[in-house]
Amino acid sequence: MISRIFKCKRLFVFFFLASSTAVIIALTLFTLQSFRRFYETWFVSVFSEGKINATHYLVGFLHYWGSITVVLAGATGFDRSRPVGKDFTFSLSFLEIVGIVLFAYAWINQYKTAIILANLRKDSSGNVVTVQHKIAHGGLFKYLSSPHLTCEILIYISLWLILFNNYMFQYVLLWVVSNQVETALLNHWWYLKRFKNYPKERKAVLPFVI
């Protein structure tokens, strides 16, 4: 009986816990994303006069705390069936490579989007001259109203691919997709209502589709 329980536990470790490589990569990418967002907030973005709801602000903190907790909870180092670090290896799988490439694409384009949005409120010298909303052009704005939200979804899809064996992370992905899609749709409808000359070919979330 005990041996069966142990075997089941080892199967759980194999199928439902991410490898040490996957966890290190995911935490590194989370760190890169956090530092870039911090830089954008303080040195790139030009915010409007609107204020964020305190509840939304708290949810943002809880999201990052919860996401990191899920990554660590699904790491092999939290399994007591073997000594921590005994089986540590660093070898990239196909899904991890795909995830890294997708993350890089989304990460770079999300930053480009932030720059485009900030420049809408600056003059040629870089001075802020307005906080009004304008129609953005260039980059992924050719296809989407809020490409930074689509990039956010792609970033979490990339992390899900990297942490594929961590079954808990799929719930983080579903949470991100649901709230980002909702926000993207609301933004898109607002732009269509606000600007009569808004480009009709732009979509909310997925180019050419929706």
Region spans (language model):
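Membrane-helix and juxtamembrane interface regions of eukaryotic multi-pass membrane proteins
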Residues: 1-64, 210
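Helix-coil boundary and interhelical linker segments in multi-pass alpha-helical membrane proteins
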Residues: 3-28, 68-98, 161-171
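Membrane-helix exit/interface motif
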Residues: 4, 38-47, 66-81, 113-116
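Hydrophobic transmembrane alpha-helices
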Residues: 63, 77, 85-210
